[in-house]
Swiss-Prot record:
Residues 59-95, 111-133, 277-300 are annotated as: Disordered. Sequence repeats lie at residues 179-204, 205-230, 231-256, 257-282. The keyword Signal applies. Keywords: Glycoprotein, Repeat, Signal, Sporulation. It is found in: Spore polar tube. This is Polar tube protein 1. It comes from the Eukaryota. Residues 1-22 form the signal peptide. Interacts with PTP2 and PTP3.
Length: 395
């Protein structure tokens, strides 16, 4: 027991040096006493020492009923400098209170007396006898990091065209589209991404790239620098664009810096045709508008390649109708040409809507792209992107 007392006394001294105790008097006759015990002989007070300094915030606050001191043992006179057998609690030296493992130690060996108090009613030490505690160093308690279980953030998935809902530019057998066509993305898109965004380089058939490089002002992420490009990719060519030329989508034939391609193949709804700054003296290529042969060139855009039967579309028409692969001449679209001249004046006697109606046949089936249904008929996409709706350069 003497050995245990020495260990506990050394623990108290060590914790005093580590500033575990506060500056208030730890020995009080009111601690641990119920109202019925106030007039009785004083019981020794107890100091609750947490097992670790980090838990003192959990163990040091609470009602008196939370911590029950062990029953007092009869004390005997203690000679200063000597160690007594009853310095420790007669009960078990440790109690488990809630989640705090605390050691219960007796702070006072015997009640103290003062000139104005009687034994059993005053504090263990008079205010003159209480030695102030000097703070040697402040050792803050190690903060306890509580890691709360956070549910993983739900990433929204944007549905894209399924394999059985093939649309122009996408093929069920996994092969790449015709050069100049825009691919329909397979897989899932990132949140907020549109159909013009897809996988990073390198791309695979059925995907559309987000091209690397520096983007010119006003160009979105679905356009970028990629030279040379491959079928199914989207490129913005380097160099300076002529006034009024917009950024086109897709890739037709290999181009040089400063040129912009006009797509061959089929465009998606909303895609625009672009003008190509051709090389002087060269003839225009179908699908391009060049400055070469002295005549205005209208691109020949093939019909959408319809996929296999997809049952009946929403408008009641069968969606397995086959179409001619090419529209041929666009009819009234060519009436703005002037032959034998060096300039090309556009005649606005017909509106773009009239040109579109004349160039397009009666709408027949539809094709589903995402959650939208589009009419698909001969020249339907041409009505959206027809050269009749834009200024036609003189070649």
């Amino acid at each position: 027991m003497k050995g245990i007392s020495k260990i506990l006394s050394a623990s108290i001294a060590l914790m005093k040096l580590e500033n575990v105790y506060s500056a208030t008097a730890l020995c009080s006759n009111a601690y641990g006493l119920t109202p019925g015990q106030q007039g009785m002989a004083q019981q020794p007070s107890y100091v609750l020492i947490p097992s670790t300094p980090g838990t003192i915030a959990n163990c040091a606050s609470g009602s008196q009923d939370t911590y029950s001191p062990s029953p007092a043992a009869p004390t005997s006179p203690v000679t200063p400098g000597k160690t007594s057998e009853n310095e420790t609690s007669p009960s078990a030296p440790a109690e488990d209170v809630g989640t705090c493992k605390i050691a219960v130690l007796k702070h006072c060996d015997a009640p103290g007396t003062t000139s104005g108090t009687t034994p059993g009613s005053g504090p263990c030490e008079t205010p003159e006898q209480q030695q102030p505690l000097s703070v040697i160093s402040t050792t803050p308690a190690v903060p306890v990091t509580v890691e709360s279980a956070q549910s993983p953030s739900v990433v929204p998935v944007v549905p894209v065209v399924a394999h059985h809902q093939a649309v122009p530019g996408y093929y069920n057998n996994g092969t790449s589209g015709i050069p100049g066509q825009q691919q329909i993305l397979s897989g899932t898109l990132p949140p907020g991404a549109t159909l013009c965004q897809g996988q990073a380089m390198p791309s695979t058939p059925g995907q559309q790239q987000i091209l690397s490089g520096t983007l010119p002002p006003g160009v979105t992420l679905c356009q970028g620098q990629a030279t040379p490009s491959t079928p199914g990719q989207q490129q913005v060519l380097s160099g300076t664009l002529p006034p009024g030329v917009t950024l086109c989508q897709g890739q037709a034939t290999p181009s040089t810096p400063g040129q912009q391609q006009v797509l061959s193949g089929t465009l998606l709804p909303g895609a625009t045709l672009c003008q190509d700054q051709g090389m002087p003296g060269t003839s225009g290529v179908p699908g391009q508008q060049g400055q070469s042969s002295g005549q205005c060139c209208a691109p020949q855009i093939p019909n959408p390649v319809m996929p296999p039967s997809m049952n009946i579309s929403g408008n009641g028409y069968p969606s397995s109708t086959a179409y001619s692969p090419n529209l041929g001449s666009l009819g009234s679209c060519v009436d703005i040409q002037k032959t034998g001249g060096t300039s090309c004046e556009q005649k606005p006697e017909k509106s773009a809507t009239q040109y579109a109606m004349e160039a397009c046949a009666t709408p027949t089936p539809t094709v589903i792209i995402g959650n939208s249904e589009y009419l698909v008929g001969p020249g339907m996409y041409n009505a959206i992107n027809s050269p009749c709706n834009t200024a036609v350069q003189c070649c």
